[in-house]
Structures are given as C-alpha cells and as structure tokens.
C-alpha cells in the first residue's frame, strides 16, 4: 500500500508542477501538450477537452496538434465501439460547436486524398446542416469529378455511392440550396443509374470482389445470399444500402417538387404513376415550350423508373440466381414460352397453302403474324400467361410487374420526344450490356409476337453471356444456354420454321437429366380459367427443369411433324415419328393416334422400321397387331428393320414371308415385355439416336 501511495503522490505532484509551469510559461507548447497527454491517458474527458481547445486556439500551427485532431476525427468516422474510440468521440463532443466545425474544416483542407476528404466534409455537413449551403454542391461536384478522373468502369463505385446516398439527399432536401432544373435532372440521372446498377449487379460482378471461390458454392443460392457486397474503397457497412428503390423514388419525388412537376399528394402505386404519365402525355402538345420541356422530363424519368423497377421485379422472380443477396432463394428459374398444350387437337390443313410455308402454324392455330405483317402493338395485348402457382407463389405480382414494365416501355416509345430522350439515357448507361434487361426485353418481344426480333434478341443475349464468364453447372450446359435454346425453338415454331424448331429441341435434349417420370397427365398444365382470347394465343412460364422442359420439347416436335404426317401426300416417316411422340401423356393423344391408324388403313400399308425401337405403349401395340389380322383389314406393315428389303427381294418365297410373320409376332411379344420401361428414357433415346433422321424428315 505504501508503494502505491508513493506513486499517487508523485503523479499528483507532477500535475501540480505542470500547472505551475503552465502559469509561468503560458506560451510554451510542450508544457501544454504534456498536460493534455496526461489528462487524455487518464481519460478525463472534460479536462482533456479544455486543454485540446486551448492548444487549438493558441498553437494552431503545431503539427502535433493536427495529428491529435486527425486521430479524434478518424474516431468520429469509425464504426468501432471500443473504449478508446468512444473516449475520443466524447472528448470531441466537449468542444464548442463552432470549434468542432472549424476543426473539421481545417482537417478537411489538409487532406489530399479525395475519398477521405469527401468523408471528412460529409461529416461536417451532417453535424452542421447550415454548412450544406456553402459546401454541399461543391462536394457533390468534386465526387462526380473524381469519378471521371479515376476512370471508374462501373457507376457502382465509392465516389458515386457517397454522392448519391449521402451528399445528394442533404443538398436536395435543403431548401436554402438553390439548384437550377438542369442540375437537378443531372443529379437525378446519376442517382437512377447508380441505384439501378446497384440493385441489379450480377453474381459475376460480386464474385470479382469476393475473390476466387469454389464454383459449386457460387451456384448455390443459399451461399450467395449470405455473401456481402463490398464497394471498393468503402467499408462493408458503408457498402450496404437498405431499400435502394425506396430511396430512388424519394429522390424522384423531391426533384419533381423542386422542378414544379404535376405531383400527387401521398404515396401512389407504380400503376398509378404510370396511369398519371399516360394522362399527362395526352396534353403535352397543349403546353408552351418551357412547360413542355418540364413535363417531358417528368414523363421520361417517372416512366423510366417504373419500367426498370418492374422489369427487375419480373426477372428477379423468374431467374433470381442472376442477382445476389436475400432476394435469391433456391427457386427454380422460369422461362416464357408459347403454349402448345393443345398439340393433341385435330389438324386442319389449308389445301391452298404449301405445308412448309412460313408462319403456317400446327394444330389448326391461327396464322401468327410477323412484325412485317402487322403492327405489333395491337397484337401484343391481352395475351394470357399461364403459370402454376406451385412454381411461382407470387405469380399475380410477377405478372403485374411484367405488364407494368411492358406498358412503360410502350409509353416511352409512343412519342418521338420521349423516345429520343429515353434512348439518349439508355446509350449513356450502356443498357445494351445489361444481361438481366436483355432477358426481360426478349420475353416482352415474345409476348408481342415479334418472333424474328425475339430470335435476334436471343442471339444478342448469347453474345452478352459469352462476354461474362459463366460458371458451369455440373452435368449440364449452362442454364442460360438452355433457356436460349428452348426460347429459340418456340420462336422458330411460331414462325412455322419447323426444321429449325426441331434442331434447337434436339440440341437441348443433350442437356436433359434422366430419369423423368411420365405422369400420364400433363404436369405442366395447371388448372385455370380459360380466357376468351383467340385459340393458341396463350403463353406459359415453365420451370427450367428437365421434368418440365422435356415434355414441352416433345410437344413442339409433335406439333412440327403433325402437319407433314396428315397431308394428302404420303409420308410414313413423319407419321411414324408422330406415333412415337403420341405415347407421351397417353391417352391424351388417343384421338390423334386413331386418326393416324385411319390414315394407315386408307393407305393399305405402312412402313416405319423404328417402330419396335421406340413404341412401347400397350394400346398402340395391340392396335398394330390387330391391323395385321383379317378383321383389322390385313394391313401390310413393315415395322422390322430391313423387312422391306427381304420382302422386295426377287427370291421371295412363301417360307420367307411366313418367316417375316413369325419375326413380327416375336417382335410384338418382346415389345409387350418392354411396356414397363420409363417412357421418357425411351423418347429421350429416340431424340438422341434419330436426330439426323428427324431433321431429314422436315427438310
């Protein structure tokens, strides 16, 4: 105890000596600084604060003072909650407000790193709102200039983030800051570009910041959703933005009020905003040039943001793996396709048209117009999209987003001055490189029935995917490649280009993962109220799984071969392919099969040497066995490989003919034993093994 008492005595005497020395030599900096050091180390906040204030006033040129002030201000910017940092913050709070402001300004002036200087100045603006008028716009412009000088490739960078999220709200919400309209539009443009790019950043961009990781982990939605996106130059906390869309629309509203737009009071839905913009467009020609320019900007920016928000919502719902964060659940992606579920319907042949004439659709559908035939805007309305709620729980909201995005796009291109301004913005933002947007535009074009444009858009999509290193899914081609193939197939089919349809379908078959159970009844057709639209005008959102896509592919192939099989011209090969494909979802195709049997009966004979390789349906086997009997019409069937050559050979005898009959009987018996085989495996083998033959049939 004695030793401790001695120490306390010495410390106390030292303090007294310093106080005495300070009184004797008030102009001596070393004495003042020594006293400050003792009080700071003892964590006596009030005393240390007074001494720091005295040094700041009396010794402003001392580097040690500024080093100390810099340490304190760094603590203000630091998110850490350790004891030392909290003490330094408390020390700063003891200083008079005027001194705090002056300190922040001086430290900022001495900082030559643009990012650090901006963060210092931002600290000043937040603590002293009255300084926004003097320094706010200058800081904003400095950040935008730094972004240009540093040649940032992406708008999602540290300078833009500080400007859009931190500085801009301070500027535009301070009514003492006078801003011309053109500057407000410039800032709104910068904010929109940043937030949209931030929200829609792809997993590829994210992975570049995360460093090399295992590919299988990157493809896992659960792993991806737990990763944090960090903007280079900022901390993890500073890089996270809560409710970016909400922030963007708040900026839109504030800019709108400052620019005297026709604003509505209260919160309005995206549908309400779009409806208001449509109304405003009707009266645009009635305004003078100044008002016209003002409301043009209102329509362009309001409609554009509604478009991007809803297009993102749609793509994020059908292909969440494109985006990072908690919005990427382990959900199967969906793909928009023409509905061909009525493929088992009867065939109506136009006798005046050549069977292969383009845009003559299968299954008696009405002619699908190409963009060369009619105005797409009239055709692209009121098409019904079928979606199974089990595959997309929020299907109503997703389809509403798709509708709002389409209508916004149409409005932006409905008037020349809107088109011109929106195109200018898109060029500046390089939206043609946005993979997610190209996915939406492709689906929109398919919806509009502009299939030639859709094919071009899909090729553009493939080029975009090629420019981004896509991780491979083990055992499959990339998901994007499969999506493109099936959508190309559906577009070629709608154009009546059946050989190209089959080519894409058969390419896609290589990626199917087997076995797939054939459920008999269609798995892809949810119960729905049939809309009163023209027959065959429906679309459907199908899951990108082998279970859903393979049956759809087989439907497309059946639709392609149907017209050729049931023409006046005989084509046993096409008819045979149809019979093989009709096994899927049996007995849905029973009526079409009976039509095929009737055609065979009219012909009196039928040759299809692949019959026993791929027909395993017991009802079909029984029907063909019956056709050979007296009661069945004693139809001459050549269903065995090389059977035709045997019969046509000049040495044909009754014995050989009898042998052929015996071979047929044995083949039928063997075939009956195969009826338990997985039909989808059989049909998959049919598509893979007979690819050349299938394509030749459609040539």
From Swiss-Prot:
Record's keyword annotation contains Kinase: no
Coarse class of the protein's main subcellular location: nucleus
Modified residues (Phosphoserine): 220, 370
Record's GO cellular component terms: INTAC complex; integrator complex; nucleus
Family annotation (Pfam families): INT10
PANTHER family (UniProt xref): INTEGRATOR COMPLEX SUBUNIT 10 (PTHR16055:SF2)
Function: Component of the integrator complex, a multiprotein complex that terminates RNA polymerase II (Pol II) transcription in the promoter-proximal region of genes.
Protein family according to the UniProt entry: Belongs to the Integrator subunit 10 family.
Protein name from the UniProt record: Integrator complex subunit 10
Organism expressing this protein natively: Macaca fascicularis
């Amino acid at each position: 105890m004695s030793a401790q008492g001695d120490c306390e005595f010495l410390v106390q005497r030292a303090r007294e000596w310093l106080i005495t020395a300070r009184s004797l030599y008030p102009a001596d900096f070393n004495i003042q600084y020594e006293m400050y050091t003792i009080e700071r180390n003892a964590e006596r906040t009030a005393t240390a604060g007074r001494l720091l204030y005295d040094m700041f006033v009396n010794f402003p040129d001392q580097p040690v003072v500024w080093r100390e002030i810099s340490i304190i201000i760094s603590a203000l910017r630091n998110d850490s909650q350790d004891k030392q940092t909290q003490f330094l913050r408390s020390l700063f709070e003891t200083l008079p407000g005027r001194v705090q402001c002056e300190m922040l300004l001086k430290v900022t002036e001495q900082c030559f790193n643009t990012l650090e200087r901006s963060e210092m100045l931002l600290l000043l603006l937040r603590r002293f709102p009255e300084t926004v008028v003097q320094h706010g716009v200058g800081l904003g412009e400095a950040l935008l200039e730094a972004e240009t000088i540093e040649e940032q490739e992406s708008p999602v960078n540290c300078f833009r983030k500080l400007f859009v999220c931190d500085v801009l709200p301070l500027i535009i919400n301070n009514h003492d800051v006078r801003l011309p309209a053109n500057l407000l539009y410039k800032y709104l443009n910068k904010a929109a570009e940043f937030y949209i790019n931030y929200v829609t950043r792809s997993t590829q961009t994210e992975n570049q910041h995360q460093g090399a990781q295992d590919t299988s982990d990157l493809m896992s939605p659960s792993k991806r959703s737990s990763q944090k996106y960090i903007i280079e130059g900022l901390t993890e906390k500073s890089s996270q933005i809560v409710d970016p869309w909400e922030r963007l629309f708040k900026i839109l509203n504030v800019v709108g009020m400052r620019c005297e737009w026709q604003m509505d009071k209260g919160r309005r839905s995206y549908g309400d905003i779009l409806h208001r913009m449509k109304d405003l467009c009707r009266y645009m020609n009635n305004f003078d040039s100044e008002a016209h320019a003002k409301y043009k900007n209102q329509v362009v920016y309001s409609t554009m943001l509604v478009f991007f928000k809803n297009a993102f919502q749609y793509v994020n719902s059908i292909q969440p793996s494109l985006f990072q964060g908690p919005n990427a659940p382990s959900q199967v992606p969906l793909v928009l396709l023409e509905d061909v579920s009525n493929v088992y319907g009867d065939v109506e042949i136009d006798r005046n048209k050549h069977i292969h004439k383009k845009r003559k659709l299968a299954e008696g559908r009405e002619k699908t117009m190409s963009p060369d035939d009619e105005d797409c805007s009239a055709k692209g309305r009121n098409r019904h999209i079928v979606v199974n709620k089990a595959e997309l729980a929020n299907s109503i909201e997703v389809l509403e987003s798709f509708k709002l995005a389409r209508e916004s796009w149409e409005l932006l291109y409905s008037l020349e001055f809107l088109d011109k301004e929106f195109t200018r913005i898109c060029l500046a933002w390089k939206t043609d490189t946005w993979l997610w947007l190209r996915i939406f535009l492709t689906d929109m074009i398919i919806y509009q029935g502009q299939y030639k444009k859709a094919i071009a858009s899909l090729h553009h999509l493939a080029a975009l995917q090629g420019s981004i290193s896509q991780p491979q899914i083990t055992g499959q081609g990339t998901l994007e490649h499969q999506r493109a193939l099936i959508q190309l197939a559906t577009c070629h089919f709608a154009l009546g280009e059946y050989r190209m349809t089959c080519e894409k379908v058969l390419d896609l078959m290589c990626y199917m993962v087997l076995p797939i159970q054939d459920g008999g009844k269609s798995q892809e057709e949810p119960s729905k109220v049939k809309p009163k639209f023209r027959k065959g005008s429906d679309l459907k959102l199908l899951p990108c799984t082998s279970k859903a896509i393979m049956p759809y592919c087989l439907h497309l192939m059946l639709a392609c071969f149907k017209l050729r099989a049931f023409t006046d011209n005989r084509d046993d090969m096409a008819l045979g392919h149809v019979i093989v494909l009709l096994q899927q979802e049996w007995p849905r195709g029973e009526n079409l099969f009976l039509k095929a049997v009737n055609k065979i009966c009219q012909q009196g004979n039928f040759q299809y040497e692949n019959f026993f390789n791929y027909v395993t349906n017991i009802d079909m086997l029984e029907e063909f066995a019956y056709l050979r009997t007296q009661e069945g019409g004693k139809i001459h069937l050549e269903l065995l490989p090389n059977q035709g050559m045997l019969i046509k050979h000049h040495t044909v005898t009754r014995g050989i003919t009898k042998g052929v009959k015996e071979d047929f009987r044995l083949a039928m018996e063997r075939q009956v034993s195969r009826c338990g085989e997985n039909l989808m495996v059989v049909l998959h083998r049919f598509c893979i093994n007979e690819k050349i033959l299938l394509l030749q049939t459609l040539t």
